[in-house]
Amino acid sequence: MRIISQICIATTLILCGSHSLYAAECSAKSGAATVPLLELYTSEGCSSCPPADKWLSGIKQDASKIIPLAFHVDYWDYIGWKDKFSKAEYNDRQRKIAAFGGAGFVYTPQFVMNGRDFKGSDGSRLNSMIETNQKLASRANLSLDAVTQANGEITLKTSAQAVKPSDAKNADIYVALYENKLVSFVKAGENSGRELKHDYVVREFFGAYQINNENQFSKIFTLKPEWNGRNAGAVIFVQNSQTGEILQSLALKFCNG
């Protein structure tokens, strides 16, 4: 079964006759099976979090099987170390997940699989969850297209469509920009003196967006040139606003120009 198609091609832009500049273009489209979304809520101010961060980094991102994201929360910053990757809006998302019927409260480190509290960061349980999800038919068609322009900017085109119009009613669409291979040298707080390494860190988060009356969603994001050359990519996912269930998710690593 073809789950994900991803294409990276070099595109030549011809300017002023004899001058040519190059841009990199990447694209991805979702397939017939549901790809699970695994979220980690973590903080550099939490002494229990580094093992969870390391475990998440060890997950090979096979975009046809699982999509990991790490949301750094800021409610531990008061202990003495401000996590530079944290945002208050990620706290809000974690609380919303708790309200869906997950753990019922927020804590770190917390893993969330498809909108539900996921305990037990062991490979066997994760593989079981992946296999279960791959048996579920996708309820949304997603696409991501990223073009690195000649000036270094990245144009990210996103689109979503519900497989069945009935699924569009409570469908919330989110777009995340993530970055890998991040390193921090912690100088205060519970992890003082430690070097922490992170992957799949959410640097920007957009949404919720909705599917229109024609069962369509599309939006274009223009990313600044500093995103070019980073170990980064984008994720789009559709979540039921009433239950927290993930209808489909899709990841794309940027092709650098």
PLM region descriptions:
Residues 22-107:
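Active-site-proximal cofactor/substrate-binding loop regions of enzyme domains
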Residues 84-104, 110, 114-257:
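Short, conserved sequence motifs used for protein processing/export or organelle targeting and
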Residues 7-19:
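Bacterial N-terminal signal peptides
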Residues 1-6:
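Positively charged n-region of N-terminal signal peptides that target proteins for export
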